[in-house]
């Protein structure tokens, strides 16, 4: 199977296929010429697909922090280290948008404001919202535009400046620990338990294409899950199946789930 056939086989959509072709060709060229190169920010699924297609290639991923979900993929020659990525000539920059603490803004508020400002999602990395500020990573190409034009989120005025990546403030992740019993480890049952919705409603979300299992689209409610699986549902959020225990006297399976708030 050649590269194009492999990508076509792995990609879930035409858009995903075109993205993989662009990314892999760019990184391939950089490796062959031994020159630095970086992509836009990729989702976890996109990162997994790039790893699969370019298996064995000397590429790396970088999102600014070790916990980052959205990361760029890059190739660095031996004469460059990771510090170059966030330097003056590097492909990634960090931004802080400050606002009055009395104003309450969410991740959704900032993402919507950034999209409304005219930048594309792939130019934005992870977004970290805390009291009075929001820190996020961007590709260097959009930095000057954002510093001049990203002035508000809704009706809230913003003071925007570039900061160094080590100064990015990451708020503590709020989670809810859930202990429950389920009849089986089917995806629809775990979604029902993790998000406290009916199994029928969970099945609707899944069949509508709103669910990802380990960052891959999944439309089968009867798909079996396992420990450490990560499930995201558009409109509901993200959960992780942390532990699968024994059975109750009635034959139900004990599970422990983390819901990310």
Give residue spans per PLM region.
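Ferredoxin-like alpha/beta domains used as RNA- or RNAP-binding modules
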Residues: 1-194, 217, 237-261
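Basic (Lys/Arg-enriched) interaction patch that binds polyanionic ligands
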Residues: 184-235
């Amino acid at each position: 199977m050649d590269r194009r056939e492999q990508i076509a086989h792995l990609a879930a959509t035409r858009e995903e296929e075109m993205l993989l072709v662009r990314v892999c060709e760019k990184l391939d060229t950089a490796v062959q010429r031994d020159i630095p190169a970086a992509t836009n920010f990729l989702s976890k699924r996109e990162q997994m697909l790039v790893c699969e297609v370019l298996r064995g290639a000397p590429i790396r991923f970088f999102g600014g922090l070790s916990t980052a979900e959205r990361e760029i993929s890059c190739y660095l020659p031996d004469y460059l280290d990771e510090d170059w990525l966030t330097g003056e000539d590097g492909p990634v920059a960090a931004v802080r948008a400050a606002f009055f603490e009395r104003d309450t803004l969410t991740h959704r508020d900032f993402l919507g404001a950034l999209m409304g400002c005219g930048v594309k999602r792939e130019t934005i990395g992870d977004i970290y919202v805390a009291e009075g500020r929001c820190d996020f990573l961007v590709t260097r190409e959009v930095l000057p535009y954002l510093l001049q034009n990203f002035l508000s989120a809704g009706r809230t005025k913003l003071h925007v400046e570039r900061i160094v990546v080590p100064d990015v403030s990451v708020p503590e992740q709020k989670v809810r620990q859930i202990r429950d019993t389920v009849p089986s480890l089917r995806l629809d049952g775990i979604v029902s338990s993790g998000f406290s919705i009916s199994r029928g409603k969970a099945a609707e979300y899944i069949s509508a294409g709103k669910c990802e299992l380990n960052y891959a689209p999944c439309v089968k409610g009867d798909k079996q899950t396992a420990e450490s699986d990560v499930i995201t549902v558009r409109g509901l959020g993200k959960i992780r199946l942390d532990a699968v225990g024994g059975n109750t006297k009635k034959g139900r399976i004990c599970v422990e789930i983390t819901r990310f708030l």
